[in-house]
Amino acid sequence: MSIRFGVSPIAWINDDMPELGGDTPLSTVLSDTAEIGFTGIELGGRFPRDPAALHNLLGSYGLDLVGGWYSGNLLTQDADAEIAALQPHLALLKALGTDVFVFAETSNAIHCRKEIPLNDTPS
């Protein structure tokens, strides 16, 4: 078995807080990723969602898609609705040949809501 290493684009661009790395071009993220020696990258918010466009973009840097984060909402919608909502994301991952799906329940997350202290317990 061989091991390949991928990286998350959050090291350059923060999808939750765009002011952190918001001016970093996607081309910089991808060229740095390849130059560092990674062979893949996790799906990020600025990546195209069209499978062919994403495949071509990553391929132009010699990269593969290694997985993709998904912010779930099971506390605010039922499981059937959540499963239906994540289908486009799963289809994109499958089309790009990755079998890594990162699911995080984020319905009541407060990390992006600056008006709420981080020590408040989600309700």
Features from the language model and the residues they span:
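N-terminal pre-domain/capping segments
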Residues: 1-100, 122
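Short glycine-enriched loops at secondary-structure junctions
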Residues: 104-109
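Short, helix-capping/interhelical loops that line the mouth of catalytic, cofactor-
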Residues: 111-113
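Glycine-rich tight-turn/loop motif centered on a GG-T
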Residues: 115-123
